């Protein structure tokens, strides 16, 4: 099966890199041509009220779709636009229409994606990651967050997307600080690739296997284009 071959490639790739490595962007709203056939994007969530004028543009996109914008701002540092973009992405993702057994994620440009969860847990993914390749956010997302998200492993993909959007904000702002946002995006990509490879082994009938594989390549490419 094509997706199984992609998963084997993902496993080889994942085990050959360290989370802190620069890994592979496409414009935020444009998938790579080689991935588009397996991907299905949804419209929305819609703009809530009047569009927000803000810098960076990625933050304006997110805020325009949040009815409670201030809730997602970092209250300890209200000037932190990178974190506001990251957290706001989660807020808009909450508004993506729910599909039983799947996870919705907002992708900018008025588009979103819904990906079914494979039959594994975040704990399973955590156990599949060699100790030598467990990065700075491993403890938070693959250990502590299991209290709320263990049975919903595509949550890891949403966190990766949020870090990618934070990277777009950092680059638009021209910040020398906040480089960890990009490091964490690379680290989360690594964990998502491990999850894809694991799903190929433990859930061979996973219905969204090709979609997840294609999405990983799409999101990786748009990140790479932003940081090159």
What are these regions (language model features)?
Residues 55-69:
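An N-terminal structural lobe/cap that precedes and organizes the functional/catalytic core
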Residues 21-57:
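N-terminal low-complexity, Pro/Thr/Ser-rich intrinsically disordered segments
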Residues 5-16:
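Hydrophobic membrane-insertion alpha-helices, especially the h-region
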Residues 66-84:
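Short pre-active-site segment immediately N-terminal to the catalytic Zn-binding motif
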Residues 94-143:
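Post-HEXXH active-site segment of zinc metalloproteases
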Residues 81-98:
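Active-site recognition of the HExxH zinc-binding catalytic motif
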Residues 137-228:
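Long, well-structured alpha-helical subdomains associated
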Residues 1-2:
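N-terminal hydrophobic targeting signals that begin at the initiator methionine
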């Amino acid at each position: 099966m094509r997706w199984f071959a992609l998963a084997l490639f993902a496993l080889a790739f994942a085990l050959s890199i360290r989370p802190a490595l620069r890994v592979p962007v496409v414009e935020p709203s444009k998938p790579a041509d080689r991935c588009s056939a397996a991907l299905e994007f949804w419209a929305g969530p819609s703009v809530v009220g009047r569009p927000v004028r803000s810098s960076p543009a990625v933050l304006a996109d997110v805020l325009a779709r949040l009815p409670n914008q201030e809730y997602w701002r970092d209250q300890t540092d209200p000037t932190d636009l990178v974190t506001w973009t990251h957290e706001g992405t989660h807020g808009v993702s909450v508004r993506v229409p729910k599909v039983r057994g799947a996870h919705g994620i907002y992708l900018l440009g008025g588009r979103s994606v819904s990906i079914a969860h494979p039959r594994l847990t975040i704990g399973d993914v955590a156990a599949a990651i060699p100790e030598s390749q467990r990065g700075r956010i491993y403890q938070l997302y693959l250990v502590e967050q299991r209290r709320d998200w263990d049975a919903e492993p595509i949550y890891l993909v949403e966190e990766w997307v949020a870090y990618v959007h934070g990277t777009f904000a950092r680059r638009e702002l021209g910040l020398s600080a906040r480089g960890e946002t990009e490091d964490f995006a690379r680290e989360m990509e690594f964990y998502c690739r491990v999850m894809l490879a694991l799903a190929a082994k433990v859930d061979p009938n996973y219905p969204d296997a090709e979609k997840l594989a294609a999405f990983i390549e799409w999101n990786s490419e748009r990140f790479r284009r932003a940081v090159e």
